[in-house]
Amino acid sequence: MLSLKMPQLLRVHQVPRVFWEEGIMSGYRCPTSSALDCVLSSFQMTNETVNIWTHFLPTWYFLWRLLALGSPGFRADPYHLPLLVFLLPACLYPFASCCAHTFSSMSPRARHICYFLDYGALSLYSLGCAFPYAAYSMPASWLHSRLHQLFVPAAALNSFLCTGLSCYSRFPELEYPGFSKALRTAAFAYPFLFDNLPLFYRLRLCWGGAHSCGRDALSSNHGYHLLCALLSGFLFAARLPERLAPGRFDYIGHSHQLFHICAVLGTHFQLEAVLADMGSRRAWLAVQEPTLGLGATVATLSLAVIGNLFIIAAFTASLLRMPGPCPLLQGSPLEEGLQAKQQ
């Protein structure tokens, strides 16, 4: 009879430095877990369990939205193509994150590679956002401007920059954690700021009363999305509350869990806001020439996927060539001072 035993959990001083999370003192999985152990650990309360489920369940929600909206009649209308393109990476990024958090304890190398793929999925999501924004959310005065025409191609280039910087940020993480964190934060903040330029401009136009905005009036869901994005960025960078009370939020309530929740809520509100723009502006946009047709959309997506996979492969190859004893793959024991702090 098959008997499954839940993996043993470790404290921070029992795992290599590469696995440490600031302010998280317990609930670590064995750093040489098997794939089965990793899957089983998702049903055990560890410091990663909530991280896994807060992105696994939303994956199915966004997939349901994609299937519901992607009915044959809806899919046949070219006007709806940018929305469907957006939903593809909206399904991908939480799934990639879920897998990264599940299998990151197999080895130091596996941990880095898992997060390389996670970062690549987020970069593609940033590109996916650009398609509906270019199609439905551009300010009226920007329509067919040079910025409008280059918006999606620039977002594709931004995805390469995002993947490259975020993957690179893992290499100096142990020696220069502050620099690594700043680099990774900037890698994701820049594509977000670029993608949302149309919304920021419309918000400026409408500040003080939507009655004067005309076609540039914003849905309240745009505001909720931007608020969730702001909270996500703050939680990702600040590492609160666990940084103020190490060990108190190891299993429930630490910043990465809250970051996941804010991120998926932001994506939900973003989808609702895009649907609102798509519906309210359709009569006006229907007479405008689309910036990208089916062929250009497929080509842009294909090149972006190939380019991001190439970047991930390059960093993975560099990682695999590193000798086993290097600090990035081994780390060192926790200093006595930190051991005393956790007691």
Curated annotation (Swiss-Prot):
The chain crosses the membrane at residues 50-70, 80-100, 113-133, 147-167, 217-237, 258-278, 292-312. Residues 71-79, 134-146, 238-257, 313-343 are extracellular. It is found in: Cell membrane. Residues 1-49, 101-112, 168-216, 279-291 are cytoplasmic. GO terms for molecular function: steroid binding. It is a multi-pass membrane protein. Keywords: Cell membrane, Lipid-binding, Membrane, Receptor, Steroid-binding, Transmembrane, Transmembrane helix. InterPro entries: AdipoR/HlyIII-related. GO terms for cellular component: plasma membrane. Homodimer. PANTHER family: ADIPOR/PROGESTIN RECEPTOR-RELATED (PTHR20855), MEMBRANE PROGESTIN RECEPTOR DELTA (PTHR20855:SF39). Non-classical progesterone receptors involved in extranuclear signaling are classified in 2 groups: the class II progestin and adipoQ receptor (PAQR) family (also called mPRs) (PAQR5, PAQR6, PAQR7, PAQR8 and PAQR9) and the b5-like heme/steroid-binding protein family (also called MAPRs) (PGRMC1, PGRMC2, NENF and CYB5D2). Belongs to the ADIPOR family. This is Membrane progestin receptor delta. It comes from Mus musculus (Mouse). The gene is Paqr6.
